[in-house]
A protein has these predicted regions:
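A structural supersecondary motif
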Residues: 262-273, 289-331
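C-terminal structural cap/anchor segments
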Residues: 315-365
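M16/MPP (pitrilysin/insulinase) zinc-metallopeptidase core fold and M16-derived inactive scaffolds
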Residues: 39-109, 292-309
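N- or domain-start disorder-to-order transition segments that initiate the globular core
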Residues: 1-35
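An aromatic/glycine/proline-enriched structural segment found at the starts
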Residues: 14, 203-261, 265-269
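C-terminal regions of mature proteins
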Residues: 3-5, 203-208, 349, 361-430
Length: 430
């Protein structure tokens, strides 16, 4: 395994690529009680059009397949074994999640780490689908989708994304729709599994007080039995999307205690930038929004004092290879006034921030939170995997943050925030 030492934060990373293409990362953390393991495929809800291995033709699968597959892999054979109980009996808690761009299976354990790793690998690597079990799962996932649709924040977010995007799959719920999941067949699941769950498209991450050489041997021996060969990168649909928003204003009524407003800005994804610059831009926009709307700012306090927002107020910037957007949201009795003052504040300071003292303080806080996060194996494993797929090491993040200046934040806010393409999305009270 190749070892990289990061002197500034005193961390070591051991990494290798196994013969079947699986990327393995191990970070030893002496004295840690818990070990955290993630097994992740670069397969999320956006990946519904692709070329299967050995084919020159694109295929399209129903929305929600990635999330559906995550559910089914917890039933990896016909024995009916309860995997949650099996992990728990070996002092481990197991879970999984699907996002727009990846699916991750994970556990934290205080004991029996080796056995739990083998159980996790076996679970993910042993698909077992019948049309009967697939059809049974549809009802379960349909109820899950309906439950999410009843959550105001979730509903508002996807209403906004649908208004922003015309054809990009970011506009679709990660779990799909009730209609789309009923189109899923066991053949769809096997096709996606054979394509995206190939070791060449996956990353295994282990962080904790472990013997690196021993854990490597355990994993390498297990993987050698799979008879898989490394494969080239999967060809995905390029996901071309127009620059303009789909709808400038959308509204829906539901049972609420207070109306809700979300402003969504559809930005250019900046696909031609290097990976490190890409991550730096993301961090710079986060700092930009913190300087405008953070809880310590006078502007935030004025919004509270004027009853324009409440504790639901929040904001987010997202920059990914094929899409980018910003959202600002809050429950409010005065959505028109809130929209007016938010847009005015952004227009005033976009590219024009001058408070160096506030910027320096925010940067120090961010660095402090990053250093603190290194005490959490869960934080390290999840963030390292996310950034790995973006082409950056988590432990390079400190250097990237330290390279950010107030001037670069101003430049990025001009380049990455498109005020000409705004969605006004609202939830009104029934």
């Amino acid at each position: 395994m190749r070892e990289t030492y990061y002197e500034q934060i005193d961390e070591r990373v051991f990494e290798t690529e196994l013969n079947n293409g699986l990327k393995l990362f191990i970070i030893p953390k002496k004295g840690f009680q818990k070990t955290f393991v993630t097994y992740t495929t670069k397969f999320g809800s956006l990946d519904n059009k692709f070329k299967p291995y050995g084919s020159d033709t694109f295929v399209t699968v129903p929305d929600g397949v990635a999330h559906f597959l995550e559910h089914k892999l917890f039933e990896n054979d016909d024995t009916g074994e309860d995997l949650f109980t099996a992990f728990a009996e070996d002092n481990a808690q197991v879970n999984a999640f699907t996002s727009f761009d990846r699916t991750s299976y994970l556990f934290s354990a205080t004991d029996h780490v080796e056995r739990n790793i083998i159980r996790l690998l076996t679970m993910v690597e042993s698909p077992y689908f019948t049309q009967e079990t697939v059809d049974k799962e549809k009802g379960i996932i349909a109820e899950e989708i309906k439950m999410y649709q009843e959550q105001p924040g979730y509903k508002l977010m996807f209403n906004t994304l649908k208004a922003m995007y015309d054809t990009h799959p970011i506009r679709v719920d990660i779990a799909g729709s009730v209609e789309s999941i009923y189109e899923i067949t066991k053949d769809d699941l096997y096709l996606c599994y054979e394509t995206f769950y190939h070791p060449s498209n996956m990353v295994l991450f282990v962080v904790g007080d472990v013997d690196v050489a021993h854990i490597y041997d355990v994993i390498a021996t297990h993987e050698a039995q799979r008879d898989k060969e490394a494969q080239p990168q999967i060809v995905r649909d390029p996901l071309v999307e127009k620059e303009t928003v789909n709808e400038a204003k959308v509204s829906e009524t539901m049972k609420l205690q207070s109306p809700r407003l979300m402003l969504g800005f559809k930005n250019k994804p900046l696909t031609d930038e290097p990976n490190a610059t890409f991550v730096k831009r993301d961090l710079e926009m986060t700092l930009f929004y913190e300087m405008l709307f953070g809880e310590e700012t006078d502007f935030y306090q004025s919004l509270l004092n004027e009853d324009l927002i409440d504790e639901t107020f929040g904001y987010q910037f997202v920059l990914e290879p094929t899409y980018s957007f910003s959202v600002i949201t809050s429950a409010t009795q005065y959505p028109d006034k809130l929209k007016e003052v938010l847009l005015s504040e952004i227009e005033k300071y976009q590219g024009n921030l001058t408070d160096v003292e506030a910027f320096d303080l925010l940067k120090k806080q961010f660095i402090g939170e990053f250093i603190s996060g290194l005490n959490s194996p869960e934080y390290i494993a999840n963030q390292y995997t996310k950034l790995y797929f973006e082409g950056v090491s988590l432990f390079d993040l400190l250097d990237i943050v330290e390279s950010i200046t107030l001037e670069s934040v101003n430049e990025t806010s001009r380049a990455c925030l498109n005020l000409a393409q705004v969605v006004d999305s609202r939830l009104e009270m029934k």
